[in-house]
Amino acid sequence: MLQVATPTATEETQTVIEIEGRASLKGEVRISGAKNSALAIMAGTILCSDDCRLSNLPALADIDKMCQILAAIGVNLERDGDRLVVDSSNVGHGPAPYELVSQLRASFFVIGPLLSRLGMTKVPLPGGCAIGTRPVDLHVRGLQAMGADVHIEHGVVNASIKGHSRRLTGAKIYLDYPSVGATETILMAATLAEGETVIDNAAREPEIVDLANFCRSMGAQIRGDGSSRIIINGVEKLHSTDFPIIPDRIEAATFLCAGAITHSEISLFPVVPDHLASAIAKLREIGPEVAIDAPDRVRLIPRDLRGTDIETLPYPGFPTDMQAQFMALLAVSEGNSVVTETVFENRLQHVAELQRMGANIKLKGNAAFIQGVPFLSGAPVMSTDLRASAALVIAGLAAEGKTIVQGLRHLDRGYEDIEGKLRKLGAKLTRIEQPVTL
């Protein structure tokens, strides 16, 4: 008898996080170095031809990618745990391979240092999270104001200093929007420019201040960082430095939400409480108390949860990078809440995944209207971007039953061993390989 073989599905695997919800948390979380600060500072090491030694560097996929990008343009790197020694003495003009740059928006940060130090560069247009267009026009206009010739050809930004001058020229630059990336690009380029550069309507984020502190540690003359006007007086050369990265305020806020949603008392160390001011204020509105036990330590004290309204704004307003995590918390907070996203378009994709878990959320434009429910239900969910992935983990901690979070490449870009840190607090979650049927 002729037997016909039955086709079998090809099995591949994907890495997921499996969460058993409703576990109480307790203990202390060690907060890693700030990803967004580290990426800009790593690019800033190009400004100096001597060694730069960085510490408190987080172990993240984005940091790995930036190391690869720097190495591809001739930078020598030696990494040991959270320490990184960078030697940019032989850096080239670029461009870095597009397959690397396309995965990391922060790769574009190298344009300012390369142009200012070498007089010309080629940098591919960047990639990263799919949360809006986030164009680089403000970066480009700032460099042009300082005397750069910039044009885009075949997806590559070509920048050079006009005429016979080997240095950019200081300029007064007004940013139409207080863009963090544009502020960082112009600030770094201005450190080696001739004369004074003034950035008006500059971004005020702590990561800007950290970058300015790093540049000052190399001999740059910068004042006003942390305000809307930054003034940079260019110098001819920068020198080597040892510099620690600040703690990650977004990671800290994420763990505060994890404590609040599980009604658990947890401590965070090290942190800079001032960097968490808006998150702490909103947590107190929602119900939990945040005690500042030391200059670098905070403690989440659980309380009943109630709804509140949140609108994302540039710093010192409520950060867009904390919006998704707080939405997960508000989904199980009594009463009504409205979360309005004003910084990025297309950054409410996590709503559909929270709805799969039983959240009562309705979208209208850039606003999410939330009616709190008593509990969420575990479900398979898909991460859509970095902070959305953290929000789904937080939701899974509070959900009844099992939650499977897929799309971990987003999570690994911005959180160092989040499951290990949560397990240490008592959460029941593990990273597993799960078959995918094609």
From Swiss-Prot:
Binding positions (phosphoenolpyruvate): K35, N36
One cellular component term from this protein's GO annotations in UniProt: cytoplasm
Entries under Pfam families matching the protein: EPSP_synthase (PF00275)
Enzyme class, broadest EC rank: transferase
Entry EC number(s): 2.5.1.7
Residues involved in UDP-N-acetyl-alpha-D-glucosamine binding: R105, R134, P135, V136, D137, L138, D321, V343
Recorded metabolic or biological pathway in which this protein acts: Cell wall biogenesis; peptidoglycan biosynthesis
The entry's keywords: Cell cycle, Cell division, Cell shape, Cell wall biogenesis/degradation, Cytoplasm, Peptidoglycan synthesis, Pyruvate, Transferase
Protein name per UniProt: UDP-N-acetylglucosamine 1-carboxyvinyltransferase
Record organism: Synechocystis sp. (strain ATCC 27184 / PCC 6803 / Kazusa)
Gene: murA
